[in-house]
Each structure stands twice: as C-alpha cells, then as structure tokens.
C-alpha cells in the first residue's frame, strides 16, 4: 500500500471515530493514551512544541475524551495543558526528586463527569514512594500516576493508571508494569482497571505478555473493527508503505482470535507476524470484564500540514464498565 492509499484509509477512519461520539451509550467512557513528545526536543524545527501545541490541544478536544493518560509531559507543557484544557483535572507529579521537574505521566479526567476518590504518583522501583528512585537497571527514573474515579451519574468506580516505561531495561519494564497492576488492585479494592501508556515494548515481549496474563489489550477486545494505523510511533516520518490496524488484524486471518487468548501463540520461528508493520508501543489495557466498543489509532495531521502534533499517534478506546 503506497503512502497516498494509507492516508486515505487513515482519513476515512476519522469520521467513523468521531461520529460515534454522538451515538455512544450514556455510560460509555472514551479513554486514550498519548505521548506528546517532550518540549525540549525538536527545537528550531517545524516540530517544536511551540509550533504544534495548539494543534495538539485541538486534537484532544476533537477526540471527545473522558479520561486519558499522557507521557513526556514537561513542566511547561503541563502548565499549558492545564490552562488550555480547563474542563479536565490534571493528576501527576513529575519524576524529578522535587516532584516538579523532568517529565510527568499525568492522567486527565473530565471534572463534570467524575469524582476522584484517590490519586497519586509513585516511582517504578523497589521503593516506589521514594522520589527519583531507580531499580532493575532502568536508564531513567520512571513514574506511574493513577486515579480511582467514580462516575457521578452511575456511581461506578474504576482505576486509571498511566506510565512511560523504560526504553533500555526490559526487566524494568516488566517489573514496573506488574508493580502498577498490583498497586491498582490494592488501591481500587476490586474496581476495574484501565492502564495506559507508552510501554516501549511490543506485545510479544515479556513486559506486555506478563500484563496480558492479568489485563487485556483493548485493541483485541474491540467489538468493532479498529481504525487507523497499526504503528503508534512514527518519529515524525512514515515509511514508503504503511498498514492499517484493520489490515494488520487480518494477517493472518486467525490472528485476532488467537491474540485474544495468548499473543505468544502466533509466533513463528520466534517472530510475531506483526513485527513487519512497525512499532506499536502505546497501549490501553483493561480488566477482563470491561467491554470495549471501539478502538482507534488517531492519525490526524496538523491542519494544512504534512506534520503531526506529536511523534506518536494517540490511541483511543470507548469502554463500558461492568
């Protein structure tokens, strides 16, 4: 599939995603994960934060979200997002020792809809309450920000956790992600879990496989065909050929049903058939009893430009709590 064909598919997916907003059930919750690319990166280029920040906020509003996690949010970006998205509450300390410096992985939630019963940030380490602590060979300090939310209309509760796991140590990714899941079980006291993030791994690697034993990848739980691209990280550029998520899920035809059970089951000679489709490292996981109505990788470019609001695409899911 050539670039122009892929772009057609990506754009064609957008009306499907947003038209559904008007007809989705009243108790449905739209969640997302979005790595927004840290502000010090790409200075003096068309992808600088100052050049793209307004388009990023516009895309967040267009997605019509109820709760979402972001990654690589620096202090200046956090200030801007708080100011420009006043309808959302922002929860998440930065990962520096003072809790105010370096990147954050915050959770946003719509204030008119939810009440936060519990919230916080902890570090992905053997001493999670110690700011800037590191374990398991991690290259950077890493955090999880979380909430226990109650829907004001239905009274239903759920945990929302968001993180950006290490890009070097696979052990740190696995240990950190399992720490998050166990803590959400504890904090939520049995409430369903939504777990988002840039996990810096493919779904066939140990960290994702470990989490998949407890939670479910929302992509494979979707009751409708996913829309948008397979890859979520594009690094500001595309390859000559791209594949949509729907096409990827048909390769081979049995892969979708198989992966609902065990992603490792489809490996051939140690390789997963999806590996050729590019890096899909941004995730939404949900508890097994959470329904997923739809799932999308949102490929919107900045208006009038062949540029994007971030070097990652956001991923979204519309869910219904049990």
Residue spans of the language-model regions?
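Surface-exposed cleft-lining segments at the edges of enzyme active sites
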Residues: 40-45, 128-136, 163-170
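His/acidic metal-ligating clusters that form di-metal
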Residues: 141-163, 170-210
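N-terminal export leaders
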Residues: 3-7
């Amino acid at each position: 599939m050539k670039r122009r064909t892929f772009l057609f598919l990506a754009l064609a997916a957008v009306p499907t995603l947003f038209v559904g907003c008007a007809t989705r059930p009243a108790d449905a919750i739209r969640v997302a994960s979005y790595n927004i690319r840290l502000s010090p990166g790409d200075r003096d280029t068309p992808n600088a934060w100052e050049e793209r920040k307004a388009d990023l906020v516009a895309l967040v509003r267009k997605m019509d979200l109820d709760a979402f996690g972001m990654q690589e949010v620096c202090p200046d970006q956090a200030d801007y997002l708080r100011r420009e998205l006043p309808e959302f509450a922002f929860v998440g300390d930065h990962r520096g020792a003072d809790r105010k410096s370096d990147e954050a992985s915050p959770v946003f939630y719509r204030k008119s809809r939810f009440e936060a019963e519990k919230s916080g940030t902890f570090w992905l380490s053997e001493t999670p309450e110690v700011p800037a602590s590191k374990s398991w060979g991690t290259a950077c300090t890493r955090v999880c920000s979380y909430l226990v939310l109650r829907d004001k209309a239905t009274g239903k509760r759920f945990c929302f956790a968001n993180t950006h796991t290490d890009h070097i140590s696979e052990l740190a990714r696995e240990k950190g992600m399992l720490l998050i899941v166990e803590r959400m079980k504890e904090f939520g006291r049995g409430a369903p879990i939504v777990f988002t993030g840039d996990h810096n791994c493919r779904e066939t690697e140990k960290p994702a496989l470990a989490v998949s034993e407890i939670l479910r990848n929302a992509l494979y739980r979707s009751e409708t065909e996913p829309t948008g691209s397979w890859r979520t990280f594009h690094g500001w550029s595309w390859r000559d050929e791209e594949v949509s998520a729907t096409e990827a899920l048909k390769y081979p035809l049995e892969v979708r049903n198989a992966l609902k059970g065990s992603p490792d089951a489809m490996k051939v000679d140690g390789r997963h058939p999806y590996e050729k489709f590019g890096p899909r490292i941004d995730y939404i996981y949900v508890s097994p009893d959470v329904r997923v109505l739809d799932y999308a990788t949102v490929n919107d470019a900045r208006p009038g430009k062949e540029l994007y609001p971030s070097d990652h695409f956001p991923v979204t899911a519309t869910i219904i709590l049990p």
